[in-house]
A protein has these predicted regions:
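Acidic, PIN/NYN-like endoribonuclease modules and their adjacent C-terminal/linker elements
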Residues: 2, 103, 107-134
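Structured helix-beta-strand junction loops
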Residues: 34-35, 64-68, 91, 109, ...
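Active-site neighborhoods of divalent-metal-dependent phosphate/nucleic-acid chemistry enzymes
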Residues: 69-116
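A generic structural signal for short hydrophobic patches within well-formed alpha-helices
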Residues: 10, 45-48, 120
Length: 134
């Protein structure tokens, strides 16, 4: 599988106070340990770095992301993301700007989204976005 892992799942995986790994965290851990391709984008890296405090956490994030390919949006991705958001809005689903762009990157690069964010489930019902299921 080719997986795009959203900020929500990385955050769950790195929380100190998590009781037990969720099914999505297990999916991430299995993918990283196996032959699955795990990719991300600079926006996710930035959100993670902004959300965790301290030099140890920062170093951990940078180390983990050093081996993860980052997909980079281009002009066409931004245009398509706007179209995706408008399509969803016309059907009553509000999509945030970043979520729209992440969904578009998954669609363009044939990646399955791994996210704990329910908004992506709504996007997937209205667009070609595919969600990875644990």
């Amino acid at each position: 599988m080719n997986l795009f892992v959203d900020t929500s799942v990385w955050s769950l995986a790195w929380r100190r106070d998590r009781p037990a790994p969720s099914a999505l965290v297990k999916l991430l851990e299995d993918a990283l340990a196996g032959d699955d391709l795990v990719v991300s984008t600079g926006l996710v890296l930035q959100e993670l770095l902004q959300g965790f405090a301290g030099p140890k956490q920062r170093a951990r994030i940078l180390d983990a992301f050093s081996s993860i390919p980052l997909v980079v949006p281009d002009r066409d991705d931004h245009v398509a993301a706007a179209d995706l958001r408008n399509q969803c809005r016309r059907k009553g689903v509000q999509v945030g700007t970043i979520d729209g762009l992440l969904a578009q990157l998954c669609i363009r690069h044939h990646l399955q989204m791994v996210s704990a964010d329910a908004d992506f489930g709504q996007i997937a019902t209205l667009t070609p976005l595919r969600l990875a299921r644990p």
